[in-house]
């Protein structure tokens, strides 16, 4: 697997308003999230990163919502997302709204989210789609050092591979909002070519039972039936 860790640090935006069409992205993401928020229950919801903190989660039944980030506002717990100050299996829902694109070690961040999530806990991930108008603008040299084009845009399939290694069950994966400057992202284009959407969303749950059985382990654990040992009986004829 191609390593995702990078040495350089790119400063993440403090709010959605710092991004071109950022508020439109946030609204589009919230529209996609609301139907899923109604399915989530528990005691604690963890929002990791400044952009996650601004996501409206009123539709979620989890009342205790904590914003965690290294800096910025509104932050309730100031901490490094790669070293979350929470106990194992203590969080019901973990929201990573465009947190991975500006993370130096996405694998480590996902492992931290996996660590703090309870069994069957919810993990929500959003990011930018590299195969979109957003991805094309990233190819322009003048824009590469400005947000959001200085972020890392991971393909949907690559992120799904990461989650499968951590034994997450993906319930939903989509791309949407094809036109970044449009309020609704271009309804007609969203309906016919959603694969070119600028935004992508993954909703997954942490599972404890392996989703794919290992055939090698399965054959080892399978009880074996002993084969009958062949035997010959010698019968002596009675003497006359």
Curated annotation (Swiss-Prot):
The disulfide bridges present are: none
Region (Disordered): which ranges?
Answer: 216-240
Q: What superkingdom heads the lineage?
A: Bacteria
User: Which Gene Ontology molecular-function terms are recorded?
Assistant: S-adenosylmethionine-dependent methyltransferase activity
What is the recorded name of this protein?
A: Uncharacterized protein YafS
> In which organism is this protein found?
Escherichia coli (strain K12)
Give the gene name. yafS
């Amino acid at each position: 697997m191609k390593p995702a860790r990078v040495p350089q640090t790119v400063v993440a935006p403090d709010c959605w308003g710092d991004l071109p069409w950022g508020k439109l992205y946030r609204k589009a993401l919230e529209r996609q999230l609301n139907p899923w928020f109604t399915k989530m229950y528990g005691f604690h919801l963890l929002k990791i990163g400044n952009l996650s903190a601004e996501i409206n989660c009123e539709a979620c039944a989890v009342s205790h919502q904590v914003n965690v980030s290294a800096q910025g506002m509104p932050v309730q717990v100031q901490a490094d997302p790669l070293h979350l100050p929470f106990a194992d299996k203590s969080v019901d829902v973990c929201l990573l709204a465009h947190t991975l694109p500006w993370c130096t070690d996405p694998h480590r961040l996902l492992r931290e989210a996996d660590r703090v999530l309870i069994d069957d806990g919810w993990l929500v991930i959003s990011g930018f789609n590299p195969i979109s108008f957003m991805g094309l603008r990233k190819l322009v040299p003048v824009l590469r050092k400005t947000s959001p084009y200085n972020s890392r845009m991971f393909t949907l399939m690559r992120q799904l591979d990461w989650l499968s290694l951590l034994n997450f069950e993906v319930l939903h994966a989509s791309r949407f909002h094809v036109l970044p400057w449009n309020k609704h992202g271009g309804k007609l284009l969203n309906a016919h070519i959603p694969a070119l959407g600028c935004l992508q969303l993954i909703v997954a749950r942490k599972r404890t039972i392996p989703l794919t059985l290992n055939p090698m382990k399965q054959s080892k654990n399978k009880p074996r039936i002993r084969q009958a040992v062949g035997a010959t009986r010698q019968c002596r004829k009675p003497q006359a």
